[in-house]
């Protein structure tokens, strides 16, 4: 069974690991690059790296970065008085150095990611949504616009999100294989990532939304538990952008795209407020591979 997952960071990465663990599933993961940013002149792809590290089984204890990493370089950057808010572990830094060197030589992000997957012995294809520069920008009070990492890391998601824009998206094209994977899939799954901040940037790349909307079988997994995000500001961002509360807001965020929505059993009352899509209530907490695989089987009916 060919499956495509649209993924942001930790939640989507954990679901990807569960999908990849099912022998009957031939998985391709398409990942958000709206969070990508330059840090100390290095190209950082947070969501791509989180997905790769998780599939390789080397992700950090919080779901991002590398397991048992050290931070000697960061300590030395502090010595020189450099802005060190966005911390990168030493092992993680090595990947950023490799990617940045390849990009300076003109290699596309998708090609570099294939090489990184081979270094970590990951067989699952992981594709950036685009090789072009697309950046999520956050509109806040006072008509000020922030880069994603400024909002998320430096300002700790404290600003109310008034608007979003995806700079460069209108001129971008899908990375090689992205639309083909969606068109050839038996099912498309939208992972339990933040809908506006992690999935909308993928859909903003011309051709991807259209391919998903045309697909006969698209399921989304809600990132909410008891109406709240387990991690991150998903519930607050959806509310401040005018989406309805709870899983009704998740369904509206994907209006015209999904056939079914998978919600946690704690939110089963939301099923009465959602029209037009099939609702499945199941335990959606995926802390390990086994629970992620069980959720994946339920989504796919395996």
For each predicted feature, which ranges?
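C-terminal functional extensions of proteins
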Residues: 231-302
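Active-site glycine-rich loop that binds ribose-phosphate moieties when present
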Residues: 162-182
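Short internal beta-strands
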Residues: 28-32, 217-224, 260-266
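Redox- and metal-dependent alpha/beta enzyme cores, enriched for Fe-S-associated oxidoreductases
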Residues: 203-241
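Extreme N-terminal starter segment of soluble prokaryotic enzymes
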Residues: 1-4
């Amino acid at each position: 069974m060919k499956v495509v997952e649209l993924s942001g960071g930790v939640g989507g990465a954990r679901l990807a690991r569960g999908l990849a663990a099912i022998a009957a599933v031939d998985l391709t993961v398409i990942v958000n690059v709206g969070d990508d940013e330059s840090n100390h002149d290095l190209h950082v792809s947070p969501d791509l790296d989180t997905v790769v590290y998780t599939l390789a089984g080397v992700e950090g204890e919080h779901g991002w970065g590398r397991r048992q990493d050290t931070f000697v370089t960061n300590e030395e950057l502090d010595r020189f008085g450099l802005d060190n808010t966005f911390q990168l572990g030493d092992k993680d830094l090595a990947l950023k150095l490799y990617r940045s060197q390849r990009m300076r030589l003109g290699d596309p992000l998708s090609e570099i990611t294939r090489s990184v997957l081979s270094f970590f012995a990951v067989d699952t294809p992981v594709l950036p949504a685009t090789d072009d520069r697309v950046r999520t920008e956050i509109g806040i009070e006072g008509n000020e616009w922030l880069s994603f990492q400024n909002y998320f890391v430096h300002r700790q998601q404290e600003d109310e999100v008034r608007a979003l824009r995806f700079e460069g998206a209108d001129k971008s094209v899908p990375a090689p294989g992205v639309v083909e994977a969606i068109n050839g899939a038996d099912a498309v799954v939208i992972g339990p990532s933040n809908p506006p901040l992690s999935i909308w940037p993928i859909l903003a790349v011309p051709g991807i939304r259209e391919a998903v909307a045309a697909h006969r079988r698209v399921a989304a997994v809600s990132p909410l538990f008891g109406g709240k995000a387990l991690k991150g500001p998903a519930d607050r961002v959806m509310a401040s952008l005018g989406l309805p509360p709870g899983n009704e807001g998740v369904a509206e965020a994907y209006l015209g795209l999904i056939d079914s929505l998978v919600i946690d059993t704690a939110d089963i009352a939301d099923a009465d407020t959602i029209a037009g899509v099939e609702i499945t209530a199941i335990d959606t907490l995926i802390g390990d591979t086994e629970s992620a695989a069980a959720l994946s089987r339920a989504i796919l009916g395996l």
